[in-house]
Amino acid sequence: KFGDIIRQPLPVATFTFLVIVIIAFVRAWVTQRFAGEIPAVSAPLGYYTAAFRLSWPLLSAAASIVMLFVAGFLIGRSSVRAELYATRCFLAMPLFGVVSCGVLLSSDFLTQSLTLLLLALASRNYYNSFHRHYCFDRMFRGSLYVGLIPLLYAPGAGLLLLIPLVVLLFRRTLREAVVALSGAILPLFFAGFIH
């Protein structure tokens, strides 16, 4: 049964995911050691996570691994709940590990891991809100997470354009669209107020 990659139990999928993440961090360390650091794109809140990473490198690496693990677990659990596969499997968890560790290109892995965690949380909240009528709190939280992403990681600004598309595709009401828009804009107001 060990050769069947689709039907691996949760502990095996979790172990595979953690091995992929550790290999990605070793690859990033070797690449940075010999080729130099690839600078990250600057963002208002990304500056603080980059400063934390420089001050506490081991703690930020551990926090990054934990954030990637939580995001992978959320993605794996969501794929089981949404019945994406014909059989109950946790294949999405190692696949998320491969994709997410391919994204970790710059030296600012803490910011990118936090961005992936926010994206997984936003996806989970959107998924839960679209299966219920008038679920304003989850719509707001999902949009709030998406609104935080460009403040942490500037290339994530394109995700803000997906909110109106998602609201239209899932035929949400105008009230839910206003809640989603206010959730996405609220972090920008706070960042503008602080800076």
Predicted regions and their residues:
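Aromatic- and kink-enriched transmembrane "portal" helix at the membrane-lumen/periplasm boundary
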Residues: 57, 93-113
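Transmembrane-helix motifs of polytopic, lipid-linked glycan transferases
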Residues: 66-82
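Membrane-lumen/periplasm interface segments of specific transmembrane helices
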Residues: 23, 179-195
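N-terminal membrane topogenic signal
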Residues: 1-18, 85
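Membrane-interface alpha helices of multi-pass inner-membrane proteins
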Residues: 138-152
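Perimembrane helix-loop-helix junctions
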Residues: 159-185
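Membrane-interface transmembrane helices that cradle and orient dolichyl/undecaprenyl
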Residues: 122-137
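Transmembrane-helix signature of polytopic, membrane-embedded enzymes
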Residues: 79-99, 117
